[in-house]
Amino acid sequence: MRFASLGSGSEGNGLVVESGGTRLLLDCGYSVKESEFRLARLGLAPDDLSAILVTHEHDDHVGGVFSFARRHALPVYLSHGTFEAHRETHAQEAIGVRVHLIGADTSFAIEDLQVNPFTVPHDAREPLHFVFADGATRLGVITDTGCSTTHIEKTLSGLDALVLETNHDIDMLWASSYPWSLKERIAGRLGHLDNAASGQIGRAHV
């Protein structure tokens, strides 16, 4: 199994997970053209992908998903809550796209990869993150998450590799010029992991 990031940040997110002949794109927060460019830098074309998975409805994760999927005839896997939340503001985007609704803790296969979605605390409708397995390797991916939970700890046990968000230094956040409401959102239990919390999760599971 291999993985590579298309990018990570408020402007967009995307990650490719590969095993055998299967390549999954996790999130697509970029435009179609930008996503194609970033794939090409990895030596990949859209036709090399098998499907797109979505973590949640925030634009930096889902902004390009349906346009890219429609352009390249790719199925999209996401939770019911994420799908409905996105449709409330982008009602027409999913037309012509094969959508598969998935739920937490219900594993499924996409070709050579087994996918285990799990729920995380984040300020979205029904966010999911994922553990990928191919019979030899288990890879966990956890990005936009406010805090760790017992369920997350259990789900991430026994991994071979972990892609983990390290979003901010808590002291620098509180000292920053961000509006107070944004500071509270980022630091809250439904926000983003600070560097220390991410380090604790990483040390415990890899």
Regions from the language model: what does each represent?
Residues 1-42, 126-144, 161:
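Conserved beta-strand hairpin/beta-sheet module of binuclear metal-dependent hydrolase folds
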Residues 4-15, 54-65, 69-70, 87, ...:
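Structured catalytic core of nucleotide-sugar glycosyltransferases
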Residues 7, 28-30, 57, 81, ...:
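Active-site metal-binding loops of divalent metal-dependent hydrolases
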Residues 33-78, 160:
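Active-site metal-binding motif and surrounding structural segment of the metallo-beta-lactamase
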Residues 74-83, 165:
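Short internal beta-strands
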Residues 80-129, 133-136:
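Metallo-beta-lactamase
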Residues 150-203:
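Cap/insert and terminal regions of metallo-dependent hydrolase folds
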